[in-house]
Amino acid sequence: MASLSGPISPTNLEMFKPGVEELNPSKLLLLSNHQEGMLYPTILGSLELLSFKRERSLNLQRDKVCLLHQESQLLKLRGTGTDTTDVPLKQPMATSVNCCHDGIFTILEQDRMPKTSMAPTLTESSGSLVTRLMSIPRLTFSIGTQVAMRLFRLGFRLARYSLRVTILKAQEGLLLIPDLLHAHPVEPLVQDRAVEPILAIEPLPLV
């Protein structure tokens, strides 16, 4: 610090020179953009990014030109007395892409969408469903009858009374099934099928 108080020599100036490293032009390039007035530091491999930006700007300008071209064609036909209602439909279909109003090209893929059928699908007919429902109570009643016979042999008075009433109602329902089928006809599958005869059940002892 003592040398700073006296006269500055050329050797002292060389000590305070900032070290500037020479830049390799192959590693760093300065490209000026005259439209925006900015400098973009570009390294190797980023030239493709700038070319992509240029192509994107050109595509946007082409979209605007396409939109203006369609509107100018409609204005020309409107003054000649020509019906212009079908012109917007014919012009986009002539090409493989459609120029929308916002300047974006969209591919026409409306025909590729799957068409779903709105018709209801029936898994099984009502006749087979009725037949299946008829077989369920019959199996249940047969199991209940066997349980009731065991309880009657054990001698529980209250259980025997309640089961006797239930079994009698079940037998009555089974006997009325043929009459109900004739009174309320259903699918031909159920009508043509003969009703199986009901097996004789052992008479229950009275309480």
UniProtKB/Swiss-Prot annotation:
One Pfam family of this chain: Corona_I
Protein name listed in UniProt: Protein I
Primary residence: virion
Miscellaneous field: The gene encoding this protein is included within the N gene (alternative ORF).
Keyword DNA-binding included in the entry's annotation: no
UniProt xrefs under InterPro entries: Corona_nucI, N2-like_embe-CoV
Top-rank lineage group of the source organism: Viruses
Record key words, sorted: Virion
Naturally occurring in which organism (per UniProt): Bovine coronavirus (strain OK-0514)
Function: Structural protein that is not essential for the viral replication either in tissue culture or in its natural host.
Protein family membership: Belongs to the coronavirus I protein family.
Location(s) in or outside the cell: Virion
Gene name for this UniProt entry: N
GO cellular component: virion component
Record-linked CDD domains: embe-CoV_Protein-I_like
